[in-house]
Design a protein with these regions (language model features):
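Long, charged amphipathic helices and adjacent flexible linkers at domain junctions
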Residues: 102-116
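Structured, non-catalytic alpha/beta "coupling" segments that mediate domain-domain communication
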Residues: 87-98
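Long, highly charged, low-complexity intrinsically disordered interaction regions
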Residues: 1-80
Length: 116
């Protein structure tokens, strides 16, 4: 993988793919890459995201994305090259927003007009 997403055709970049196809069509790596925003020197954001998922899978086989919820145990060292505490916080915030959205009660709308 190249060190920069700028070398990819624009249509193949995760953010552009999300806008064009919707989030359900992106891989877990692509969605994580969007949250991370940038890679690190010599490593693309896709590589960092892929390494993070592999790291979590190694620690919790079968855990997949759910294993990311346990990233809070990170201290000042990097879990994977290019992923420090600030990016871990971004991932945790995104995951917990998703959990809250999934757990939020669905409001029922009362329709008084059958044509509404």
């Amino acid at each position: 993988m190249t060190a920069s997403l700028k070398r990819l055709p624009e249509a193949d970049r995760p953010r552009e793919r999300l806008l064009r196809l919707g989030p359900e069509k992106l891989t877990d790596v692509e969605l994580l890459a969007i949250l991370l925003g940038t890679g690190s020197r010599g490593r693309s954001v896709i590589e960092v995201a892929r390494d993070l998922l592999h790291h979590c899978e190694a620690k919790d086989p079968g855990g997949g994305l759910r294993a990311l919820l346990h990233l809070r145990d990170v201290d000042k060292k990097e879990l994977v090259k290019g992923l420090g505490p600030a990016k871990v916080c971004t991932i945790l915030a995104g995951l917990h927003l998703g959990l809250r959205a999934a757990a939020a009660p669905i409001r029922q709308v009362e329709l008084s007009n059958p044509r509404a």
